[in-house]
């Protein structure tokens, strides 16, 4: 090896680059997906979707109180009040479950490809928490990071288009 860097160090740098280059697109994707989900829930259940959705679908009876508990905890911790969106406390897995629960509505956005949507979200969920909590790059397989990045790109195609 004529390089002054060891193979191990080069491998580390490659993983670190992949790790860092995945975080920003993931963060942007997650925020965009939250907006799509919120807009969808408002369209399905109206402006009072936080109270009306649980009356119509049992899934929300379980998940909304959990999200609300996180919201209350953050408001108490950071002394912030005001109008905070409940979905700000959702993870991509929760957003995936909401979209699948409301697939009849969201299928148009994702062009009816539920399998691609689910597989892509599963790939994203696999790396999201380690990335969000700044785990060491070498603990996340590079193949998982690349798969998540591809999944984000695949789903962004749907999110970037105007919807009727």
For every predicted segment, state its role.
Residues 1-164:
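Amphipathic alpha-helical interface elements
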């Amino acid at each position: 090896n004529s390089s002054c860097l060891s193979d191990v160090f080069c491998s580390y740098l490659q993983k670190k680059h992949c790790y860092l280059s995945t975080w920003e697109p993931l963060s942007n994707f997650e925020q965009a997906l939250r907006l799509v989900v919120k807009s969808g829930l408002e369209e399905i259940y109206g402006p009072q979707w936080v109270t009306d959705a649980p009356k119509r679908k049992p899934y929300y009876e379980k998940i909304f109180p959990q999200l609300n508990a996180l919201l209350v905890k953050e408001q108490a911790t950071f002394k912030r009040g005001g109008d905070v969106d409940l979905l700000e406390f959702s993870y991509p897995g929760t957003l995936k479950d909401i979209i699948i629960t409301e697939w009849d509505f969201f299928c148009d956005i994702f062009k009816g490809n539920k399998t691609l949507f689910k597989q892509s979200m599963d790939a994203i969920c696999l790396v999201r928490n380690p990335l969000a909590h700044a785990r060491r790059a070498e603990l996340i397989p590079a193949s998982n990071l690349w798969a998540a990045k591809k999944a984000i790109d695949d789903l962004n195609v749907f999110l970037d288009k105007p919807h009727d």
